[in-house]
Amino acid sequence: MKPADSASLPAPDAALQKAIDGNWRDRVYVQRDVYRHPGQTLAFFGIKPTQTVIEITPGGGWYSEILAPYLRDKGKYVAAVVDPAAVPEGRGRDSAQRGRDELEKKFAAKPQVYGKPSFVSYVPKTPSFGVDNSADLVLTFRNVHNWRMAGNAEAMFAGFYKVLKPGGVLGVVEHRAKADVPADDKSGYVGQAQLIAMAEAAGFKLAGKSEVNANPRDTKDYPAGVWTLPPSNSHDKADDAKYKAIGESDRMTLKFVKQ
């Protein structure tokens, strides 16, 4: 599948481009713009600076560094993070707590940049992301495979539907498999038709597909699955050049609307 012609993709508005160009962004994160296309991706989802936007599992804040400043003055950015108490005691719980703490520290260190982002903690098996019908846009980047493997995908999509306003948008970017994958698949990829079916089962309508994050060099047949590729690079160091030439994964970019 060929990537979309960049000339045919929506361009980010001036405020969004300013956030993308911000000197507060982690330099390592900026290097990945060539693979993640934040401006065109967010423009495709129809983001506006006045919206309430919930980002699901923001991790280290790659998109947070763009979204929070963009929404600071007129909108609202909400980071939805897994409730550490919902994770079994041990390394997993410690990691969940540490991830939230580090993101809070990032925001607190530069209030003039990020303002006061909100946090919501959720339980993956029974998620609630806020007051019903309160969000304009829900975003999730490269997370669906984890929910599938944990058996939580149905509950997560239902939670997205509940928190969105009628007409609200769900934007999904995910590693794209060649076809539907079985329930026990550990590759990190998900079939595009499969993902669309998940969203539609929750009540969403598919409103658009973009190839902005496509990568035809991704053969999707690696020993460590998608984690073989950058940025995880789970491979022998001798193969660095090989996988760097492929780049990050082939990704579907899907826009859904709440009816």
Predicted regions span which residues?
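Conserved class I S-adenosyl-L-methionine
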Residues: 48-59
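A short glycine-rich, Lys/Arg-flanked "PGG" loop and its adjoining helix->strand segment in the class I
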Residues: 68-69, 153-166
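Conserved beta-strand signature within the Rossmann-like core of class I S-adenosyl-L-methionine
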Residues: 78-80, 167-176
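S-adenosyl-L-methionine
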Residues: 92-127
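A short, conserved alpha-helix within the catalytic core of class I
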Residues: 124, 146-159
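A short acidic, Gly/Pro-enriched loop at the edge of an enzyme's catalytic core
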Residues: 127-138
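Conserved Class I S-adenosyl-L-methionine
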Residues: 183-209
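C-terminal lobe and adjacent flexible extensions of AdoMet/dcAdoMet transferase-like proteins
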Residues: 243-259
